[in-house]
Amino acid sequence: MAKHIVELTDALSNKIAAGEVVERPASVVKELVENAIDAGSTVIDILVEEAGLNKITIIDNGSGIEEEDVATAFLRHATSKIKNEADLFRVHTLGFRGEALPSIASVSHLSMETSTGETKGTTITLEGGKIIEQKSGHARKGTQIEVSQLFFNTPARLKYLKSLPTELGNITDILNRLALAHPDISFRFSHNGKPLLQTNGNGDLRQVIAAIYGVSIARKSIPVKAESLDFKISGYAVLPEVNRSNRNYISTIINGRFIKNFALVKAIQEGYHTLLPIGRFPIIVLQIEMDPIIVDVNVHPAKLEVRLSKEKELGQLISQMIKEAFHKLQLIPDGEISKKQKEVQKSEQIQMSFEENKPQKETPTLFSKSSIPEYVPSDLDAPREDDFILETMPSYEPEQEVEHAEQPKERIPKMYPIGQMHATYIFAQNENGLYIIDQHAAQERIKYEFYREKIGEVSRELQELLVPIVLEFPADEYVRLEEQKAKLEEVGVFLENFGQNSFIIRAHPTWFPKDQEEEMLREIIDEALSAPSISIHKLREDTAIMMSCKKSIKANHYLTTQDMEALLDTLREASDPFTCPHGRPVIIQYSTYELEKMFKRVM
């Protein structure tokens, strides 16, 4: 017998909606804080007990809610943020569906005090979505919402929650993203009375980065910006030498909303291409402004994913912006000193002279070594060394430096080799200090740039082979190569059919290494066959990386002084001499000051 179709009760509908909107305590925090942001708050307090399972309190100084609208706010799809269908495609607020408050109230005990500041405030109490009490009262302007006994009437949901530290980590991550997206708002977050985050809301994104990731990372960040007809991008990118093992430190923010978008993350990684080791990811915060009409935020229950109508153009703009920002900098990482260094007075240093030295143009520094005032949070925070936020932090604008100073042709200074360690590392010096160079990585970078340029030229200058090379393949590989012959020609492989499942090669580009032609051809073909589909751009890139790695000097290879000098001089001519194509560092510097500090010559 067929079952009758019935309309669900509001209580059941709210619980179903809560299953999408309220997955865990972090979801509650996200929705309520976003409401506070939409209300125009400048200060938001977030007080959490037992990772949100016991109590979540959000206090803001926003616009508040009129008394006659308080009960309506807990009805499904009741909102003040959109009025008609057209508004749905021009969303300027973080929330707009009117689902958060009724969904949260349906699975918890909730109380709210709110006031517009012009009339008496209103207090409302709900349990499981039902209004228990509503009364007038005296309240300051703004809203305070307290959520307790979360999931008390849906015990199955509790089974799927993680440990308290994990749930607290989820809350912290949400608040970190919101703080990065809104540096003009002061966020004060505490757990069980212990302050975990405080930002001062002065609009300085770098200070928020310092509060979240630490001052040392903020010091390693550089401003980035780009603009087109459709997009305006600003933010901070941390130098490649500081990286992480996952993508969690990549923050993309569109119109004040933190979003997850694979294409944009891929574009960011492309901007850092060859600057990061394989399997490592950057720390970067990008704030992107665009017309709401070209971004659809109504495609995900938690609004974390969006649909962009000009995604490819935005990705290209991001990649180019990052590449240009780092291309202006000297990216030689400093040698790390084991202990944290405090500010010391610099005594007179030993003067070192080099007869061959030429005057070096001064390289812009990211931060001056002047003392930086510390900001000690109040109210929710207590003084703690790791929680100090920079009140003022010198900024570095690469564009300004370029306008006022002639760019040196070489991106690294002249270095004079003084020896080799383990036949693997070159030691060199100049008036700036000591340099350690990975000889394989250095030549790999040089050869990579050479091969990348040659492969991209698609030169028709060919060297005829005295003895043509015949290559045989299994039938499946032969068919794939037959389909991709035109693309292979663009990287210098000219295949002619020669019998069953065979090709003959009669010529090759003139830049192929002598006496290694067949090996080179096979490696390029193997590279093409290893990919599920052949992209000419990727094939050129992968081929250049493969050839540069295999044709470079290896570790345990002794070099003469002349060889080392030639290698270092050639490295100076590279466009990006700081990392190998795989992202490993080529060169590390120990400044004269750092060395003298190690030997206690400066106090």
Swiss-Prot record:
CDD domains reported for this sequence: HATPase_MutL-MLH-PMS-like (cd16926), MutL_Trans (cd00782)
GO terms under biological process: mismatch repair
PROSITE patterns xref list: DNA_MISMATCH_REPAIR_1
Gene3D superfamilies the UniProt entry points to: 3.30.230.10, Histidine kinase-like ATPase, C-terminal domain, MutL, C-terminal domain, dimerisation subdomain, MutL, C-terminal domain, regulatory subdomain
GO annotations of cellular component type: mismatch repair complex
Protein name from the UniProt record: DNA mismatch repair protein MutL
Annotated function: This protein is involved in the repair of mismatches in DNA. It is required for dam-dependent methyl-directed DNA mismatch repair. May act as a 'molecular matchmaker', a protein that promotes the formation of a stable complex between two or more DNA-binding proteins in an ATP-dependent manner without itself being part of a final effector complex.
Gene Ontology molecular function: any one: ATP-dependent DNA damage sensor activity
